[in-house]
Amino acid sequence: LAWGDSRIGNVLYQDFRPVAVLDWEMACVGPRELDVAWIIFAHMVFQELAGLAGLPGLPDVMREQDVRATYETLTGRALGDLRWFYVYSGVIWCVVFMRTGARRVRFGEIERPGDVESLFYHGSLLRRLLDGPDEGVA
């Protein structure tokens, strides 16, 4: 079972310990790499947004090597290559940004963009990912 929307914003904490996980509408049967890549990629998206806002973000948080090591230590299971799952996550984030952009247009918050890709705030991240594994994505 894959959670589907594994990210820090969907976890409730009490005394710095997770006590509940929320937002299960993307749950599905899938490999563990789906959720692991999603949580890392979600952080990369927010890191990209921080950069667009001129902020440093948290570049030392949710690094693949750290998440992978922690996951493997806690579960005793090795993870496979996450690249395909990052691309998948990037495409799903495109859908999310298109939907939120359409809603903003509908309610008059923004003008309809001439190029829908301008709504992909993580576009440069996705392009780097598609360009190849040595482009500094993870």
Label every model-predicted segment.
Residues L1-G4, V21-D23, I40, Y86, ...:
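Short beta-strand segments
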Residues L1-L34:
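Active-site acidic catalytic loop and adjacent metal/ATP-binding pocket
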Residues R17-V19, A78-L79, P133-A138:
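Conserved NTP-binding catalytic cores of kinases and kinase-like/nucleotidyltransferase enzymes
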Residues P18-L22, R63-R77, Y121-R127:
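Short amphipathic alpha-helical segments and their helix-coil junctions
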Residues C28-P31, P56-P59, G114, S118:
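Pocket-edge positions in alpha/beta enzyme catalytic cores
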Residues L34-T75, S89-F107:
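Active-site activation/catalytic loop segments of kinase-like enzymes and analogous catalytic loops
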Residues R77-S89:
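All-alpha amphipathic helical-bundle segments outside canonical DNA-binding/catalytic cores
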Residues R103-A138:
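Regulatory N- and C-terminal appendages and interdomain linkers associated
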